[in-house]
Amino acid sequence: MKFLFAAGGTGGHINPALAVAGEIREKYPDSEILFVGTKDKMESKLVPQAGFDFATISISGFQRKLTLKNIAKNIRTLFYLISSSFQTKKIIRDFKPDVVIGFGGYVSGPVLRSAYKMGIPTAIHEQNAFPGVTNKALAKHVDRVMITVESVRKYFDSKNECVLTGLPVRGEMLRADRDFSRAEMNIKDGEVLILSMGGSLGAKAINEAAVELISKRADEKGYRFLHSMGRYGLWVPDKIKENGVDLENHPNIEIREYISDMDVCMSAADIVVCRAGASSLSEIEALGKASILVPSPNVAENHQYHNAMALVNNGAAIIIEEKDLTGDRLIKEVDELARNKSKREKIGENARAMAMIDAKSKIAEIVVGLAKNSKA
């Protein structure tokens, strides 16, 4: 069987696709898998690193804010749309896939359109609680629409019923053990670990609120802090020191630029403060963590807000919109969770109840079924 995956732009699109491709490769070692993406985005590194073949097309997204610069970019995008149609058809003719799967990002558009016009079975997966423009348009034509959360179903006008699959979670997250992780981080019984992060770049609003939280609660009995400041947050340690905290010698505060052992840190945490990207929320659900979510307002269709509300509406998270985020507001919410164990645990239990830890195998099963039917 031959599988062609289209995913690009961000890790939120690429990593779930890689997880499913890995599942197929493990169960069907004789299968052939090809990814299609762009040469200058994240997929051009992540896909080859995962050991999959990779083909490129020229494509970019439309700029919605109309400026002279963006109008020029949109004209170039129109040209790319025409050329990418020829590129994708050639890739499909050469590879001859049994099924084509799109995981979002603008690269999915031309690949899936070419595939369904050529009569090849197609499927898409929507990671967010509000669909992207590309997936919404494709849903009317593809054979299967797979969704991460139930609340997104109403936004799709698809020719087939949407299938609820969840979102694949990394294996190391599912294997993480809370007691082992807390012992590794030297967290004592009764201590509450507050894990805060604003992504690999470092969201300014989260960094500023976290600085106030850590500075004002540095000596609060039973509080432990681990904060990821990101690439653009290197000012954070100096600001905490300016606020009178002896950061180098403080036993209960750790500041990192990036957290590479997220499985250990998140499994050890009692409270997680973060953005509301789909992958992060699936991990929070899988580990059953109480979370305070600050959706990014700078994403397409404001989808992080919808992602967060899917949990909030089930009593599985607390939301603070970025426009409402202050140090004092974050302190209030953290204090309430840190000092109220039963509330913290209830939110975590509600989050765990939303987890779909078999998402990877479920998606792979659907995709393989389409491939087998194409051969029948």
What are these regions, as identified by a protein language model?
Residues K343-I357:
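A short, well-ordered alpha-helix in the C-terminal region of glycosyltransferases
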Residues P97-V99, I259, D263-S282, K289:
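Acidic donor-binding loop of glycosyltransferase active sites
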